[in-house]
């Protein structure tokens, strides 16, 4: 067996504590511990994962592994699949998980049959804190601030529960409006109301219907004027309490429990500049945004253990992550220019509450010595010695609520000669005020089991294993869009002012102003979807003389999915009934079943330039499937990008062939070196491409490209600086890091849709990624520090079409420092500074910076105490 690597030092040991698991795994994987995450000061899972080799983060939420996006990866929580609160993707955004709940993060880059077959870049398993083996009571309190957010920021009148990240009903769609939509059969325009009034009998005029329409509009929340206020510093509180008790005289029974709570509240100013690639001096805008992010996490786990052979555990996890945004955008286009005395002005508010609620039950049972003594009366039971049986059950739901997302469109009047601001007016438009109310509910039930039965024969250790997984998911997405405005010339004098000054009761109810409230959208924004996976797998792991190890097996999956657009305000069959024709379901359904094989070979010669050496080779065949909305033959407006997106029911799954070669050197001092080569061949990769849009929205759709491949080199290391012979101080320092150099090639083929480049790199693939860290552990264990650097090369942000070049996100160089002081063993003071280089996000297209967004320098201070 491989020897255990043991070293000392607060920070350096954190990296080495997870090495043993990585050594013993049959496939290529990387593991990061909670201590490592704490060392570099990352607050979420997504930020922590970017420190691993060949891992990058997009939009602060989505993980790209080896150049492949979230479509080609899967995320599990304690080994089980969970739902996603993401509005337009099937994958769970990893910024939802705070680092406070994490025990370890495992990124498996080599496929094994016990993992979902939807595997390309890798599988991320978020493993929550395990039950303690002794009494623990921890508390941590922190504060912080951002260099861009130390002054004033935008806000608006919200609800009384905003500090907890939930709305108290202030933003909810008023019952009076939903009642009116039902009463008038989904058409609340004056003509629709008039038809309903006529059906009810009596003499009614269009003027009567217009008045009813205006009365309905009065129920909208219009007290939304932006205002500036001083921003509070960051607040974060984290606490944990747990214990393990021995029960009974023999002490074989143990009962344990752990509870963790985490609360965070922060304000951030984000300035963003958008420019047209073709006319950046004419078509551009500047957005000042203030975002309040509130997080609330609670988890409880209880467990029972008998003789260290049988474990039962029940855990509950609740996550809430809310972003409350207020923004003001001012800009120009070809129709509104400062030299002609006008510019555009848009006010926007958006409150997005995301929740994840997970209940997990699991068990592990081993026929060890204590169990066999109890079952000795069963004939032949000892022939099953060391049989292990694992099982799990997960019931989870994810919800996203975006109430009262509002945008007011306005026009500023300027002095053409000086550019001096003169006045602002709400635009003369039927949708000058755009209201959206969005709800998403994702429900997942999954369960499974696995067994393994190790036995030895001669020089061979053989471990056959197998199991079953079931996954069922249902999703409902409902969006209501309302437009309020006027195009009446008589109303023009009353459009001058802010939204709160213009959309008053007096102005709306004045018939001469001609205000009209209408249902917006195109009828297919809402949808219902579901999918199921039945899976069975088997594997054999054979080790010969502790020198050669072969692990080979296969997974069978029966996959089915359907996604159907619905019009929740179609009243052909009555109020409250959503009609979905059987033909639509059949046309939108997709099903497939297949086998996915995998094999991994490891050579373990012992010492080869190191105390321990391993050489791994892996091969597998996997798949990547379209997201729920991508297969729906409907057009919808993406709530995040405002793009007009059309699904493609003709999409087929992508087939992947994966090859890995990795050499690992482990030294007795704890130093280690890893060198990996990887190659992936993808048939029918799914890509997002530009499609015909509208004057107000770009168009996007999805196609199967012809082929793609990804290949690269990863190098990872940990090295102490004791070789410098500078006494105890050189022993206190270490360097660690990783570098990934890779490339990819995507061939679109005949589905190019006028794309400028039929061949290019995969979207969001960075040719190089680098992580460097200099660590310090004081000999007296009172001080520790880390200087961490993360950077990536430019990556394709979106593909250009009709001759326009591709757009590239520019390199981002992140430099962070963390210092910890331990005045006593139980107490720690931690100071963190992030993005010390004050980098900003930039996207270039054809030499023009089409997007700039500030990030700011972050400073944080935490105090923790362990009782």
PLM regions and their residue ranges:
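A beta-strand signature from Gram-negative outer-membrane beta-barrel systems
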Residues: 96-140, 866
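Membrane-embedded beta-barrel scaffold of Gram-negative outer-membrane proteins
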Residues: 374-381, 386-394, 398-410, 464, ...
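Transmembrane beta-barrel wall of Gram-negative outer-membrane proteins
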Residues: 179-327, 355-359, 597-600, 604
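Conserved C-terminal beta-signal and adjacent last beta-strands/turns
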Residues: 375, 432-440, 449-456, 461-465, ...
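N-terminal periplasmic "start-of-domain" segments of outer-membrane beta-barrel proteins
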Residues: 6-38, 70-76, 80, 85
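Outer membrane beta-barrel strand-and-loop segments of large Gram-negative receptors
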Residues: 440, 447-450, 492-495, 499-503, ...
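Gram-negative outer-membrane beta-barrel transporters
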Residues: 546-547, 672, 676-686, 697-798
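Short acidic/polar hinge/loop motifs at secondary-structure boundaries
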Residues: 51-53, 80-110, 129, 155
């Amino acid at each position: 067996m491989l020897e255990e690597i043991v070293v000392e030092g607060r920070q350096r040991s954190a990296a080495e504590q997870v090495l043993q698991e990585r050594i013993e795994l049959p496939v290529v994987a990387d593991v990061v511990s909670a201590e490592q995450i704490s060392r570099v000061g990352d607050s979420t899972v997504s930020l922590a994962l970017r420190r691993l080799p060949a891992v990058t983060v997009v939009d602060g939420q989505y993980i790209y592994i080896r150049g492949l996006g979230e479509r080609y990866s899967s995320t599990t929580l304690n080994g089980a699949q969970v739902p996603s609160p993401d509005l337009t993707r099937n994958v769970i955004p990893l910024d939802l998980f705070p680092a406070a709940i994490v025990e370890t993060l495992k990124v498996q880059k080599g496929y094994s049959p016990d993992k979902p077959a939807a595997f390309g870049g890798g599988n991320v398993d978020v493993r929550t804190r395990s039950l303690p083996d002794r009494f623990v009571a921890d508390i941590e309190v922190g504060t912080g601030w951002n260099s861009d957010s130390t002054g004033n920021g935008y806000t608006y009148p919200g609800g009384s529960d905003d500090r907890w990240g939930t709305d108290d009903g202030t933003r909810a769609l008023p019952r009076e409006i939903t009642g009116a939509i039902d009463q008038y059969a989904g058409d609340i325009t004056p003509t629709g109301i008039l038809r309903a009034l006529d059906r009810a009998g009596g003499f009614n005029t269009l003027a009567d219907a217009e008045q009813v329409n205006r009365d309905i509009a009065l129920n909208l929340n219009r007290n939304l004027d932006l205002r500036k206020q001083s921003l509070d510093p960051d607040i974060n509180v984290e606490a944990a309490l747990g214990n393990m008790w021995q029960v009974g005289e023999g002490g074989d029974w143990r009962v344990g429990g752990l509870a963790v709570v985490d609360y965070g509240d922060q304000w951030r100013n984000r300035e963003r500049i958008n420019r047209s690639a073709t006319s950046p001096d004419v078509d551009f805008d500047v957005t000042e945004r203030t975002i309040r992010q509130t997080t609330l996490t609670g988890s409880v786990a209880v467990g029972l253990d008998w003789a260290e052979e049988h474990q039962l555990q029940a855990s509950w996890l609740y996550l809430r992550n809310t972003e409350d945004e207020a923004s003001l955008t001012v800009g120009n286009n070809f129709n509104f220019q400062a030299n002609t005395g006008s510019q555009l002005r848009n006010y926007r508010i958006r409150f997005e509450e995301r929740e994840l609620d997970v209940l997990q039950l699991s068990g592990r049972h081993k026929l060890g010595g204590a169990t066999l003594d109890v079952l000795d009366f069963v004939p032949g039971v000892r022939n099953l010695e060391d049989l292990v049986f694992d099982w799990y059950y997960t019931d989870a739901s994810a919800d996203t609520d975006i109430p009262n997302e509002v945008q007011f469109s306005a026009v500023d009047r300027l002095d053409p000669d000086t550019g001096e601001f003169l006045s602002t007016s709400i635009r003369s438009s039927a949708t000058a005020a755009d209201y959206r109310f969005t709800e998403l509910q994702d429900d997942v039930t999954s369960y499974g089991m696995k067994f393994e039965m190790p036995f030895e024969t001669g020089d061979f250790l053989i471990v056959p294993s197998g199991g079953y997984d079931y996954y069922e998911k249902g999703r409902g997405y409902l969006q209501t869009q309302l437009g309020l405005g006027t195009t009446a010339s008589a109303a023009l004098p009353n459009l001058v002012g802010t939204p709160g000054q213009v959309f008053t009761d007096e102005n709306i109810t004045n018939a001469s102003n001609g205000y009209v409230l209408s249902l917006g959208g195109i009828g297919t924004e809402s949808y219902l979807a579901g999918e199921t996976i039945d899976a069975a797998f088997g594997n054999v792991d054979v080790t010969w003389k502790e020198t050669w190890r072969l692990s080979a097996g296969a997974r069978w999956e029966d996959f089915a999915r359907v996604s159907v657009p619905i019009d929740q305000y179609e009243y052909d069959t009555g109020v409250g009934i959503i009609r979905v024709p059987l033909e639509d379901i059949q046309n939108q359904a997709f099903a497939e079943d297949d086998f996915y094989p995998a094999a991994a070979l490891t050579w373990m010669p012992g010492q080869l330039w190191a105390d321990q050496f391993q050489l791994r080779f892996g091969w597998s065949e996997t798949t990547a499937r379209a997201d729920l909305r991508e297969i729906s033959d409907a057009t919808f407006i993406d709530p995040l990008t405002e793009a007009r997106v059309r699904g493609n029911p003709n999409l087929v799954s992508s087939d992947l062939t994966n090859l890995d070669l990795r050499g690992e050197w482990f030294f007795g001092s704890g130093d280690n070196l890893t060198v990996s080569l990887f190659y992936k061949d993808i048939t029918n990769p799914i890509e997002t491409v530009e499609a015909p849009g509208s004057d107000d929205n770009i168009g996007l759709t999805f196609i199967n490209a012809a082929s793609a491949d990804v290949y690269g080199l990863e190098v990872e290391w940990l090295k102490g600086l004791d070789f410098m012979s500078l006494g105890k101080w050189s022993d206190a320092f270490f360097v660690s890091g990783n570098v990934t150099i890779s490339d990819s090639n995507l061939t679109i083929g005949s589905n190019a849709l006028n794309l400028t480049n039929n061949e290019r790199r995969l979207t969001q693939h960075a040719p190089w990624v680098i992580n460097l860290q200099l660590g310090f552990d004081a000999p007296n264990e009172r001080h520790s520090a880390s200087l961490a650097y993360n950077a990536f090369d430019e990556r394709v942000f979106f593909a250009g079409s009709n001759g326009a070049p591709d757009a590239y996100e520019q390199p981002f160089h992140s430099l962070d420092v963390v210092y910890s002081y331990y005045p006593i063993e139980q107490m720690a003071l931690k100071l963190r500074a992030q993005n010390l280089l004050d980098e900003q996000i930039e996207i270039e297209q054809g030499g023009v910076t089409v997007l700039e967004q500030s990030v700011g320098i972050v400073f944080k201070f935490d105090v923790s105490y362990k009782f």
